[in-house]
Amino acid sequence: MTNIHPTAIIEPGAKIGRNVVIEPYVVIKSTVTLCDDVVVKSYAYIDGYTTIGRGTTIWPSAMIGNKPQDLKYQGEKTYVTIGENCEIREFAIITSSTFEGTTVSIGNNCLIMPWAHVAHNCTIGNHVVLSNHAQLAGHVVVEDYAIIGGMVGVHQFVRIGAHAMVGALSGVRRDVPPYTIGTGNPYQLGGINKVGLQRRQVGFEIRLALIKVFKKVYRSEDGFFEALLEAQEEYGHIPEVQNFIHFCRNPSKRGIERGAAKEAFQEESVDKEGALVES
């Protein structure tokens, strides 16, 4: 049963699904769609051609679907789509897109923490975490299972690869390869995200292959792209390695991140559970 508080303002034309909860002082504009089992908490504001997927919770004072913060925007019809079972926490801002027919898209099972900002034309995959005050500029792409730490700034058009983890306070100006971990401003890669991949039950042999490929590519004396070709010949049969190589060989206009910290090249050993550890 849908439960709408009498102080909520819901404009005629808004589409409200079944078992939706709308708390006090929420504002829902006329072109918004709330799918079944959505919860919108007090003072949230949802505008524009926005669709909120089933089971998603919008926390107090979040703002979704507002006019993009882009001077190029001239009132075109643009969209915001948020998937199922997401948590959009307090004061998060997800603006609409720029250019006719384009969409800001957030996948399923994402956590957008307080004060995070998702700008125009961003695309976020499934199971992504944006930590407190993470700031995505326009046209950023964040792939599945990536984690963006607190107070990170991501330059427009940058891509963050799947399963990457970007440490807090980082400034990211170039594409971050999948499966990597890093931090800093300027940003430096710290190697493969071993702990994250193990938690997601990525197999030992795959993790080890990714580590070897990363080291081959990032400390090669033959050149970055030449090393990618060598890695393709040796490990290209592994889908995760193939994804890493394809990502690095096809960067955005920002280019691929080449900086790597010294600790990224430490030798690896294995503990009694089969986990990779630094020696």
Swiss-Prot record:
One Gene Ontology term, aspect cellular component: membrane
Domain of life of the native organism: Bacteria
Assembly behavior: Homotrimer.
Protein name per the record: Acyl-[acyl-carrier-protein]--UDP-N-acetylglucosamine O-acyltransferase
Residue spans crossing the bilayer: none
Pathway this chain belongs to: Glycolipid biosynthesis; lipid IV(A) biosynthesis; lipid IV(A) from (3R)-3-hydroxytetradecanoyl-[acyl-carrier-protein] and UDP-N-acetyl-alpha-D-glucosamine: step 1/6
Spans annotated as Disordered: 260-279
Intracellular or extracellular location(s): Cytoplasm
Reported function: Involved in the biosynthesis of lipid A, a phosphorylated glycolipid that anchors the lipopolysaccharide to the outer membrane of the cell.
PROSITE patterns: HEXAPEP_TRANSFERASES
